[in-house]
Amino acid sequence: MEFARINDNDLCAISVVSFPIGTAFSVPISNLSRILSAIRETYVIAGTLGQIHFQMMNNSAHICAFTYQSGPSIVKQTFRYGILQLKIISKLFSSRKYSGIVIFFMEFPPFLPMIAAKMLNNKVYWLLPSKISLLSKDMSSKLTAVLSKICYNICSKIILYSPSLVSYWNLEPYRHKILIAHEHFLDFETFTVTTPLSDRPPLIGYIGRLSSEKGVQHFARALPAILSDRENLCVLIGGNGQLRDSIAASLQEEGIAARVDLTGWISHEELPKYLNQLRLLVLPSYTEGLPNIMIEAMACGTPVLATPVGAVPDVIVDGKTGFIMEDNSPECIAENVMQVLEHPDLERVAETGRRFVEENFMFERAVERWKEVLDEI
């Protein structure tokens, strides 16, 4: 694609760079591009894992996407990842006349593209959506940590979802260059209450990636205790990921597979329908940034039970806007799920949470905050 030249007198344009991204990340990057393009000319340069539909993208954001296929071996994977970075660097060079700000929106350090963006005299920002790498201690994670430190020093600013993430992600040495902003907003005509909580079936669930950092394996292990206590209760587990087969096998072994619906991937369009069926959404994550599914559930009047990780405590105040559990052990999950389902003011908590999200996650508020961030640049 060819970028359209903006007038010399105009404010510099913004390039958003993200790679490699999967289907689940299409909403966050689409939201960010929509916010930024309401402020300035915006270009999205993305490396995608397969064909990705960028949802909710308005027409004023320009998209350039490179498809990235993970290799069958470490060597091929590294080679293909290197080629992807070279393609992104090439696009940064070709668009250098039109962009003065580059925002890298990704967890893993964009080492080479960030150096290239800096060499082109761009103001470089790193918006961190999560820090899954903190959970691993293998060699690749150690390399990621080293490259991350280099990128923290290279970039002009680091953008986080919450001040609490500074210490949680061990970023105290860079506090002087940290700004707070997020890309979260909702369409409240889509994410709304269509079925009152009292009219919903006895159904609890988890919706998200089926991977170890999400703690979904512990939720599955908690289900025998939960279901034995409530004979009419059923469970929904929505999403795909590397743990899908092992979770399905464990449900069969425990003899509860008939009461658990493993739906697979749930599209963003179908999500409100599923959320309006749940009496409780459980998020037993080890680590989070600011999970979209949390605010989407709350907007639909669905109570959320979550671990106090990332920016979750900024949104969920235990017993007021939702519920917090101490950890994600199966025993803790089971105990808290049963307590929440028996909570005498569950509908009031759900309504308070819904109002909080409606007041704090409007598109207009997100745009205003990003205007403030860009004014600091």
Regions found by a protein language model. Name each.
Residues M1-H53:
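N-terminal subdomain of nucleotide-sugar transferases
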Residues S26-R34, P202, Y206-A225, Q242-A248, ...:
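A conserved mid-protein helix/loop that constitutes part of the nucleotide-sugar donor-binding site
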Residues A46, C64, S141, A145-T192, ...:
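Donor nucleotide-sugar binding/catalytic pocket of nucleotide-sugar-dependent glycosyltransferases
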Residues L84-Q85, I101-N122, W126-L128:
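An aromatic- and histidine-rich active-site surface loop
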Residues Y286:
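Aromatic "clamp/platform" in nucleotide-sugar-dependent glycosyltransferases that forms part
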Residues P303-A306:
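Short hydrophobic beta-strand element within catalytic cores of glycosyltransferases
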Residues D318-G319, F323-P330, Q339-P344:
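Conserved acidic donor-binding segment of nucleotide-sugar-dependent glycosyltransferases
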Residues C332, Q339, D345-N360, A366-E372:
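A short, well-ordered alpha-helix in the C-terminal region of glycosyltransferases
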